[in-house]
Amino acid sequence: ANAGIVVGIDPQDYRQDGQRDGSAVNPLDGVACQRFWESRAFELGGGGYQAPGRLVGDFIKGQRSTVLGSVLPSYQPGVTLTDLAQPGRGSLPDYALAAIREALPAFERQIKGFSMPDAMLTGVETRTSSPLRITRGRDHQSLNVKGLYPAGEGAGYAGGIMSAGVDGIEVAE
């Protein structure tokens, strides 16, 4: 089965070097952040649209994956085994990688087999929600365009299909 692990980030996390200092000031910094980490993943995957990947067991131990395990990656066109967690040079900011490393054992306690050593981490997915939020008032109407009711993921108010549906219902009401 496939699953995603989401690490929340805020505008103060948008610096491209992965540091958290609150220096983000441009509304498009979120887009720049996405592009930076997607480009890094492209490079780590070898530049041919293969995704960077690593076995969960190796990721937790801080070891490099050299061969696939019993769980084969489902991503097409394929996965290149690499070190997703090189300090300062990994596929995500160090704090995000640390959060994933901490969360995996907790997931395992709730879902047996979730973090089995041969499971494959494939990354990155940077688009769980819009990096921009279209501002809206208490009535859910856009503050800038009368008659526009921004809702869901594309408007920056949801991070998945369920929360987008809930937001859409709230806006419609």
Name what the model sees in each region.
Residues 1-86:
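An anion/pyrophosphate-binding glycine-rich loop and adjacent beta-alpha core
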Residues 5, 44, 134-136, 150, ...:
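Generic low-polarity alpha-helical segments
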Residues 13-17, 143-145, 158-161:
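Short helix/loop capping segments that flank catalytic or ligand/cofactor-binding pockets
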Residues 52, 56, 130, 139, ...:
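Glycine-rich, flexible loop/turn motifs
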Residues 83-152, 165:
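A glycine-rich dinucleotide-binding beta-alpha-beta segment and adjacent secondary-structure elements
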Residues 152-173:
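A conserved FAD-binding loop/helix module that cradles the flavin
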